[in-house]
Amino acid sequence: MASEILVDHRQKALALLKLDADKILKLIQVQMDNLTMPQCPLYEEVLDTQMFGLSREIDFAVRLGLVDQHEGKKLLDKLERELSALHDAFTKK
């Protein structure tokens, strides 16, 4: 029973982290589409702040034993690749 609860908490933690990563991607996409260009200091500040916050969330979940360190790094790497692709698409417009 306890192991089932732990697995459930791990799944929920990873799902919440993925939701936060998706929110960051959407926030940056809206910002690029409507507000600022990637070279703008505001864009860079928002991106840096959001990525730092997510990395701290992941670190916290890893320290609690809810998320594997490799899985957390994978999530950050995936988000960075998606943001890079979004940036490339925007600059090619």
UniProtKB/Swiss-Prot annotation:
Alphabetized Gene3D superfamilies for the sequence: SO2669-like
Pfam families xref list: DUF1507
NCBIfam families referenced in this protein's UniProt entry, alphabetically: PRK13666.1 (NF010187)
Family of the protein in this entry: Belongs to the UPF0358 family.
Protein name: UPF0358 protein BPUM_1375
